[in-house]
Swiss-Prot record:
Catalytic activity, reaction form: solabiose + phosphate = D-galactose + alpha-D-glucose 1-phosphate
pH profile: Optimum pH is 7.6 for phosphorolysis and 7.8 for the synthesis of solabiose.
InterPro entries (UniProt xref): 6-hairpin_glycosidase_sf, 6hp_glycosidase-like_sf, Gal_mutarotase_sf_dom, GH36_catalytic, GH94_Enzymes, Glyco_hydro_65_N_sf, Glyco_hydrolase_94
Protein's job: Catalyzes the reversible phosphorolysis of solabiose. Catalyzes the phosphorolysis and synthesis of solabiose through a sequential bi-bi mechanism involving the formation of a ternary complex. Is probably involved in the metabolism of solabiose released from solabiose-containing compounds.
Family: Belongs to the glycosyl hydrolase 94 family.
Source species: Paenibacillus borealis
Alphabetic keyword roster: Carbohydrate metabolism, Glycosyltransferase, Transferase
Name of protein: Solabiose phosphorylase
Disulphide-bridged cysteine pairs: none
MF-aspect GO terms: carbohydrate binding; glycosyltransferase activity
GO biological process: one example: carbohydrate metabolic process
Enzyme Commission identifier(s): 2.4.1.389
Active-site residues, Swiss-Prot/TrEMBL: 456
Biotechnology: Is a promising biocatalyst for the efficient enzymatic synthesis of solabiose from sucrose and lactose, in combination with sucrose phosphorylase and beta-galactosidase.
Length: 768
């Protein structure tokens, strides 16, 4: 386990007590107008505008990249000795007497001490303003009076658009002396909007400032020893046509035991007057602490309605706290490439359990990127018009899950525009999607792949218009069944339900006839009619997704379902989770896709790609394999016993997209965390598939699937205004199902009971 920190008792915070991590450990803070990453040193980047998890913007997002290169630090300087240091250790890297960094849900707090001076810095953003709000505290812990200077430093970027001329030709800084505000301007004509200015301000009057990076660092200086800090004085520079910074120097004389607190603001603006308005608004007495209290209350409300208690504290902490924050980030900020059609729908599926209003908003937003004929773009921000075969199949399960969570059936009749022309109800969007995919079939009566499927890097199988995806066909079978269920139970159209089920049967027959390879399902046929994911291939002979989805969708039945899972166990297992495929490719094959050109053991080429691994957990639960489900969960879990964060580099509180695979020299390491569909599926894997709380239209099904060594676990589940207290007892060391179900002290037959709808608390007791 990680040797550099630990969770607090309730898991809402992770406290770093050591600086020597494999890479900077990130937290994210955001609102609709700003997104910032804050690492355990206090550094990080920030951006203004349309939220996307990428900081370096390609053309088309209209975002301003506020802060450059992670350069956002506080320097503490002793006037007597000239020594200086950072509360977060980096970049000066002076050995501190005391250090900690606390990452919470939407905030970070640094605390450091050196030479009798303690310094703390807390950062968050409020609900509405494009400003990082830092609260700095200095304490004199020594027995004598001390003069201390604090230098708050941020480097402005102010980029994020296609440039046709030199950036530095348009940039300069103002210092608004009457308010002591630094404003960095970018007036380039190519800007898509006016919000490409940055500003720095504070609640106490500074004793100096710098706005030019060269002036602050010195001609050959760096962030580990900035010239202004070394000298102990700023030059009050005004930058023009050069790299810009916002540095405010504050000088304090502290008696023994004395403490001082002040606030620093770093944010975005569209000119001097906006910078003034934001500064005055946020620095009004009591405003910052009121905003912080609102943030804490918001996070409490988000986390308290679904809370699990399992034998493992880390599972509880991540499920109850951190994975919800991670899914929220994914839903609101998208991914590094923007907002993906499939990604946003899967995020909506997850958050519908604890933020149903956001789920509804995300479904609406995503459906606007569906064409009238039913196909969907890959994503937006910026618009990616590639047609991946899987877009349409995610609509039905997501909308269905939202309806089962909320009972908001009127949503089906809400009008949402199509991307190209016209509009349709949500229900019409769903029907159009499954009908499009059901008719978009190739030679083997399987769904045409086009630019790829869920596996983005299978982008060579169908570009010629003939390749077919076995996995998308299986996912279509699942989507058709979900749509048919809605048609029968909510729309009350039995004829339509039969039509959809007939389509599902045809797809199932085609997959079983043409997609079965003898011991497992193929991944695809390419444009040349060649099998992808076949035992006849030396590389990429088996793919994970077709096997897991065949089981979880019910397409594979009986012996064949068992063969799928056995193949996964025997051929795709690894210490870090199930592999996307095996063996990894070593030679590029354009008729399969870019993944064949990747170094073995990265991205989709033979890695424990965690998002795909979550499908395996669900498949295990559907098959009643509680031990195997939790084994896979444990391998994907960050900072696991087999792959601690000291090695993987993954934040101990956030799921990663993938671990490097066994064929890679970096096996078990991670490239990044936070922005991944893994989070939503891991949340659902625990709260729905493992602890077994399945929402329905007018009922609840209880079907736990847990490891046999869990003697007891429980969950609080607020659902449609009622509170259900679920307790699962497993004295018989079972893995799935139940022997007895008791509701409010009364034993009932079966595993389904009606939704109460009375707003009260009800006990649900399970004996396995």
């Amino acid at each position: 386990m990680a040797g550099f920190g630990n969770f607090t008792e309730n898991g809402s915070e992770f406290v770093f007590t050591g600086t020597q991590t494999p890479r900077p450990m990130l937290n994210y803070i955001w609102n609709p107008r700003i997104l910032s990453g804050v690492n355990h040193f206090g550094g990080g980047d920030g951006a203004y505008g349309a939220r996307s998890a990428a900081y370096i913007d390609p053309e088309g997002r209209g975002r301003s990249s506020l802060f450059r290169g992670g350069n956002r630090y506080f320097y503490i300087r002793d006037a007597e000795t000239g020594e200086f240091w950072n509360p977060g250790w980096y970049p000066v890297k002076r050995t501190l007497d005391r250090y900690s960094c606390t990452h919470g849900l939407g905030y970070t707090r640094l605390e450091g001490a050196y030479g009798g001076i303690a310094a703390g810095a807390r950062v968050f953003v409020n609900a509405e303003d494009p400003v990082e709000i830092w609260t700095v505290t200095l304490t004199n812990e020594s027995p004598r009076e001390r003069e201390i200077k604090v230098y708050s430093f941020v480097e402005f970027s102010l980029e994020g658009y296609a440039r046709y001329s030199e950036y530095n030709s348009y940039v300069y800084c103002d210092y608004l002396a009457e308010d002591d505000i630094i404003v960095a301007h970018n007036h380039a004509q190519e800007r898509p909007h006016e919000w490409f200015d940055g500003f720095a301000a504070a609640s106490v009057k500074p004793t100096g400032y710098e706005t030019g990076k060269r002036a602050f660092l010195g001609n050959y200086g760096d962030t580990d020893s900035p010239g202004s800090v070394v000298r102990g004085a700023c030059s009050n520079s005004l930058a023009a046509c050069e790299d810009m910074v916002g540095v405010l120097e504050h000088t304090f004389t502290l008696k023994p035991g004395e403490e001082v607190t002040y606030h620093t603001l770093w944010g975005a603006a569209d000119g001097n007057e906006t910078a003034r308005e934001l500064t005055r608004k946020l620095l009004a007495p009591g405003r910052i602490e009121d905003d912080f209290a609102r943030l804490l209350a918001e996070k409490t409300a988000m986390t308290e309605d679904i809370a699990v208690q399992t034998p493992l504290a880390k599972v509880n902490h991540i499920t109850n706290m951190w994975v919800k924050q991670q899914v929220l980030l994914c839903a609101e900020a998208g991914r590094a490439t923007g907002k993906g059609f499939r990604d946003q729908l899967q995020d909506a599926w997850a958050v519908s359990a604890f933020l149903p209003g956001l789920a509804k908003e995300k479904i609406r937003e995503t459906l606007k990127y569906q064409y009238k004929d039913g196909k969907c773009v890959r994503g937006w921000l910026p618009l990616d018009p590639h047609i991946y075969s899987d877009g349409p199949v995610w609509i039905a399960p997501t909308v269905n899950a939202y309806l089962k969570e909320t009972g908001d059936y009127a949503f089906l009749q809400e009008q949402v525009p199509y991307l190209d022309e016209g509009a349709g109800t949500v229900w019409e969007h769903m029907l159009t999607a499954v009908r499009y995919s059901s008719g978009d079939l190739g030679e083997h009566s399987l769904v045409l792949a086009h630019d790829g499927d869920w596996n983005d890097s299978l982008n060579g199988i169908g570009t010629g218009g003939k390749g077919e995806s076995v996995w998308t066909s299986i996912a279509l079978y699942h989507a058709l069944n979900e749509t048919a269920e809605l048609a029968r139970e909510v729309i009350r159209d039995e004829g339509l339900a039969r039509e959809l089920l007939e389509l599902a049967v045809r797809i199932k027959e085609a997959v079983n006839a043409n997609g079965w390879d003898g011991d497992w399902y193929l991944a695809a046929y390419n444009d040349h009619g060649e099998k992808v994911g076949s035992h006849t291939e030396q590389e990429g002979s088996i793919y994970l997704n077709s096997q897991t989805w065949a089981v979880m969708s019910g397409l594979a039945e009986g012996e064949r379902a068992g063969q799928c899972l056995q193949a996964v166990d025997n051929k795709l297992d690894s210490p870090y989770g199930p592999l996307t495929l095996s063996p990894p490719y070593t030679e590029y094959n354009a008729s399969i896709g870019r993944l064949t050109g990747f170094v073995p053991g990265i991205w989709e080429n033979g890695t424990p790609y965690c998002h795909g691994g979550t499908f395996k957990i669900v498949a295990d639960c559907v098959a009643g394999r509680g031990n195997e489900a939790f084994d896979t969960y444990s391998k994907i879990l960050p900072d696991s016993a087999a792959n601690p964060s000291d090695h993987s580099g993954c934040e101990p509180y956030a799921f990663t997209n993938m671990y490097f695979g066994p064929a890679n020299p970096r096996a078990g390491e991670t490239a990044f965390a936070w922005v991944t569909g893994t989070a939503g599926w891991m949340f659902r894997a625990v709260t729905q598939y493992m602890l077994g709380f399945y929402p329905g239209y007018d009922s609840i099904r209880i079907r736990p699937c847990i490891p046999e060594d869990w003697e007891e676990c429980s969950m609080k589940r607020v659902y449609r205004g009622d509170t259900y207290l679920l307790t699962i007892r497993n004295k018989n060391r079972e893995q799935c199902g139940l022997k007895r179900l008791t509701i409010d002290g009364k034993e009932i037959a079966g595993d389904v009971f009606p939704i109460f709808g009375d707003g009260l608390t009800h006990t649900v007791e399970v004996d396995m």
